[in-house]
């Protein structure tokens, strides 16, 4: 059985993510542990953490994935933002460890017009500091593939490899996003394009490092460098692209987590549609 889940709200109390996942029949869930568009940090009470861990055992939804705030930029050339991003990532990862979260997914950073090589060097220094200050035991740090807008680092598999290769002894891996890789120039919705993408993933030794797939169609066309998520089958990737992924013997062992627009009962609709594509 392929594991298909979705991103859920963690508003009001973190432990409510389990009920919200169950409501849409999600096998796995992803959520934020702070507002994705605010630097504000809420200290969680011991009672809230205990409720979360109790429900984790009760609901058996697995894996649990936390997505980093969108405000972080570990490639920033603005020193204040750079340091604030590092400290905030560490803050989030400490809570992930306490809550026994399986995976922490992050957009590594944006160069925003600055030289890409220097941006990569700044991300590597940030990663080095993060890993030197934490001893991750429960949570694996995942670098997400990105679409390439605003000088995003991680829009090619070569860049992703460059970011994680120096830390092979750490708990680090990859999160593939179908919308992002399609928008960045990998034509994953044809057999030829998918096979070419998978070969490159293997060549960079990233297939075995891939732990989570963000399952999103794309509102923007192939190679657009635009990050615009769409409901499954309603975008430029189309059903065939997801059918190929879901029936691949390597990828169908991984969790497929939706990040599609939150509209009515569309999470349940998208989950059931993905299930229908499995042979």
UniProtKB/Swiss-Prot annotation:
Q: Which UniProt key words apply to this protein?
A: DNA damage, DNA repair, Endonuclease, Hydrolase, Metal-binding, Nuclease, Zinc
Originating gene? nfo
Q: List all disulphide bridges recorded for this chain.
A: none
Q: Please give the organism.
A: Sulfurihydrogenibium sp. (strain YO3AOP1)
User: InterPro entries of this UniProt entry?
Assistant: AP_endonuc_2 (IPR001719), AP_endonuc_F2_Zn_BS (IPR018246), Xyl_isomerase-like_sf (IPR036237), Xyl_isomerase-like_TIM-brl (IPR013022)
The family line of this record is: Belongs to the AP endonuclease 2 family.
What EC number(s) does this enzyme carry? 3.1.21.2
Residues that bind Zn(2+) 3, according to the entry? 180, 227, 229
Example GO molecular function term? DNA binding
What is the catalytic activity of this protein?
Answer: Endonucleolytic cleavage to 5'-phosphooligonucleotide end-products
Q: Kind of enzyme, top EC level?
A: hydrolase
| Record note on cofactor | Binds 3 Zn(2+) ions.
Protein's recorded name:
Probable endonuclease 4
Name any cofactors this protein relies on: Zn(2+)
Q: Which GO terms describe its biological process?
A: base-excision repair
Annotated membrane-spanning segments are none
The keyword DNA repair appears for this protein: yes
Q: Which domain of life is it from?
A: Bacteria
């Amino acid at each position: 059985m392929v594991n298909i889940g979705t991103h859920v709200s963690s508003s009001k109390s973190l432990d409510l993510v389990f009920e919200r996942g169950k409501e849409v029949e999600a096998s796995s869930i992803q959520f934020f542990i702070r507002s994705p568009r605010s630097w504000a940090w809420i200290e969680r009470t011991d009672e809230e953490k205990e409720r979360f861990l109790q429900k984790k055992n009760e609901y058996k939804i697995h894996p649990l994935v936390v997505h980093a705030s969108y405000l972080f930029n570990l490639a920033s050339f603005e020193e204040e933002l750079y340091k604030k991003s590092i400290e905030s990532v560490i803050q989030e990862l400490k809570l992930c460890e306490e809550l026994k979260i399986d995976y922490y997914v992050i957009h590594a950073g944006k160069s925003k017009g600055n030289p890409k090589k220097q941006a990569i060097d700044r991300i590597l220094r940030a990663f080095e500091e993060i890993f030197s200050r934490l001893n991750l035991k429960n949570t694996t740090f995942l670098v997400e593939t990105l679409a390439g807008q605003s000088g995003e680092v991680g829009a090619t598999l070569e860049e992703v490899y460059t970011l994680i290769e120096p830390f092979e002894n750490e708990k680090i891996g990859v999160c593939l996003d179908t919308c992002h890789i399609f928008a960045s120039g990998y034509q994953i919705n044809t057999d030829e394009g998918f096979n070419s993408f998978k070969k490159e993933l293997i060549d960079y030794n990233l297939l075995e490092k891939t732990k989570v797939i963000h399952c999103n169609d794309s509102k923007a066309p192939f190679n657009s460098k635009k990050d615009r998520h769409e409901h499954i089958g309603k975008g430029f990737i189309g059903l065939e692209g997801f059918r190929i992924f879901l029936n691949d013997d390597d990828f169908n062992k991984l969790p497929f987590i939706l990040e599609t627009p939150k509209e009515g009962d569309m999470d349940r609709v998208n989950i059931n549609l993905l299930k229908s594509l499995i042979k």
